[in-house]
């Protein structure tokens, strides 16, 4: 049996595009949990890199914008080159809390060779309505492509085992790439997903914490994700049978304290 994964066994990969507002807080929070942080600067034209220049991290710079998918690919490649057992991805805008990193690792040990998703289930009513609707619609399509239900397919805070990081030739860019990673891991490796409840932070009308405007564009990006996933579903065939199988396979929530099941309802959700 493999030794449990600990923080030094993984890398934190942070794709960043014009994140000068929050990037230092994000990186310092990640370093407090894990000594191995890889920042992918996607052609930023602000002071993103300068804000963290004195911190003990690896920085990979794109001279021009290549998209989040390219950033994740480069981060995965660097992590695999250095022999890490997995990668935790998190966004550079501060919406993900580094305090959830130990819980992601705990779930990775409870469910070996699973992708672990930080699912935005806590205080979900605070999520902007347009984002919540887009996420729920995307969840349906991506789950169909994978063959099983998933809680929050579009969260950027995830643990990927090394076997998934090493997958080559994954199509798609930006948010489409993250969706395709789940589908390819399922179809090519038989890897399932498990989710842990997290709270994602959003810009409030008032308050001291500021975030930059999201790079996610609901109509544009949802269309790109949906059209791509539909193409994948059709390519795999047996569309109705796959739909029935997906509906019959509940999402997995790693919730050892019972926090989520006591407060929110996915009645078909399995907890671990």
Report each predicted region and the residues it spans.
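Hydrophobic helical membrane-anchoring modules
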Residues: 1-7, 147, 171-272
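Acceptor/aglycone-binding surface of glycosyltransferases and processive sugar-polymer synthases
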Residues: 63-66, 70-81, 98-175, 203-216, ...
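Short beta-strand/loop segment that forms part of the nucleotide-sugar
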Residues: 14, 27, 35-44, 60, ...
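N-proximal low-complexity "stem/linker" segments adjacent to membrane-targeting elements
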Residues: 1-29
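Short, structured coil segments at secondary-structure junctions
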Residues: 33, 54-56, 189
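Short beta-strand-to-loop acidic/aromatic patch adjacent to the donor-nucleotide binding site
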Residues: 84-95
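Acidic helix N-cap motif at the loop->helix transition within catalytic regions
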Residues: 21-25, 46-54
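A conserved acidic beta->alpha catalytic loop
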Residues: 41-50, 94
